[in-house]
């Protein structure tokens, strides 16, 4: 086709449309119709429901004696079962700990002006043995007959990969020299005798415990990672000067 202008002319042609140059259609990957296909269900992130286990210290209101010899106890005594405080499988994860306890000094401690400090540890026993560590010397680098000043205690060199300290803290007891609940004339401003509350929260512990195929919840039923609570009084007079611990520790696990 010719197109004339005043001085010259140009030739133009209609462009032929190639049907193959158009955008290709999207092929269906499945042979079934779309309306008959199964849809994937929508899953929601549900909050994890934790179980609770209470470990009582000092049953019957008597309390557990805390001396310079120390006290070692296992906290995650989860028996296998279907209850809210029992484990359903051989692998558990302890998330949080909550201590609701109280400390009380001995009667001889209140009769004279005294000051005592208690040292507390949360320790993970990674390589559980056949015998429970009843002595402090099996964990700390101290003599077998004990040692004063618990603030200097350190994990044994040959046990530093087995016993892992997760948390430690201190508590104090102070006496004015009068029996608990007794009367005295005014002498000077002083701290009154009292029971020391101990409310400690240990969050995000996330300790994974592997159990043996025994179904029990004792130390010998654990294959890996037992949760230990250790407490020591700094007064070496274990006969007259000691502390008493009341209350329980609640373990949150799944």
Swiss-Prot record:
Compartment annotation: Virion; Host nucleus
Disulfide bonds: none
Residue span of region Disordered: 1-38
GO molecular function, one term: structural molecule activity
Pfam families: Gemini_coat (PF00844)
GO cellular component, one term: T=1 icosahedral viral capsid
Motif (Bipartite nuclear localization signal): 10-35
Phenotype when changing residue 89 to K: In strain: Infectious clone pBCT028
Keyword DNA-binding: yes
InterPro entries per record: Gemcoat_MSV (IPR000143), GV_A/BR1_coat (IPR000263), Viral_coat (IPR029053)
Chief localization: virion
Keywords (A to Z) from UniProt: Capsid protein, DNA-binding, Host nucleus, T=1 icosahedral capsid protein, Viral penetration into host nucleus, Virion, Virus entry into host cell
Composition bias, Polar residues: 1-12
Entry keyword annotation includes DNA-binding: yes
Subunit structure: Homomultimer. Binds to single-stranded and double-stranded viral DNA. Interacts (via nuclear localization signal) with host importin alpha-1a.
Role of this protein: Encapsidates the viral genome into characteristic twinned ('geminate') particles. Binds the genomic viral ssDNA and shuttles it into and out of the cell nucleus. Plays a role in protection of the genome from degradation, virus acquisition and transmission by insect vectors, infectivity, and systemic movement. The CP of monopartite geminiviruses is absolutely essential for virus movement.
Protein name: Capsid protein
Species per Swiss-Prot/TrEMBL record: Beet curly top virus (strain California/Logan)
């Amino acid at each position: 086709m010719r197109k004339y202008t005043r001085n010259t002319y140009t030739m133009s042609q209609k462009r032929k449309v190639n049907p193959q140059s158009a955008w290709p259609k999207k092929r269906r990957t499945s042979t079934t119709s779309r309306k008959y296909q199964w849809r994937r269900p929508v899953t929601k992130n549900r909050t994890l429901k934790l179980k609770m286990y209470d470990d009582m210290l000092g049953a019957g209101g008597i309390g557990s004696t805390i001396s310079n010899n120390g006290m070692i106890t296992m906290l995650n005594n989860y028996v296998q079962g279907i209850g809210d405080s029992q484990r359903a499988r051989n692998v558990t994860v302890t998330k949080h700990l909550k201590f609701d306890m109280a400390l009380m000094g001995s009667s001889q401690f209140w009769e004279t002006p005294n000051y005592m400090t208690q040292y507390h540890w949360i320790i993970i026993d990674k390589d559980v043995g056949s015998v429970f560590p009843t002595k402090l010397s099996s964990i700390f680098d101290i003599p077998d007959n004990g040692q004063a000043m618990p603030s200097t205690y350190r994990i044994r060199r040959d046990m530093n990969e087995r016993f892992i300290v997760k948390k430690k803290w201190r508590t104090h007891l102070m006496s004015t020299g009068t029996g608990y609940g007794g009367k005295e004339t005014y002498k000077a401003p002083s701290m009154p005798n009292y029971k020391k509350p101990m409310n400690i929260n240990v969050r995000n512990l996330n300790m994974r415990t592997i159990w043996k195929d025994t179904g029990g919840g004792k130390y010998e039923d654990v294959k890996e990672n037992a949760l230990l609570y250790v407490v020591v009084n700094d007064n070496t007079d274990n006969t007259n000067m000691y502390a008493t611990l009341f209350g329980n520790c609640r373990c949150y696990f799944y």
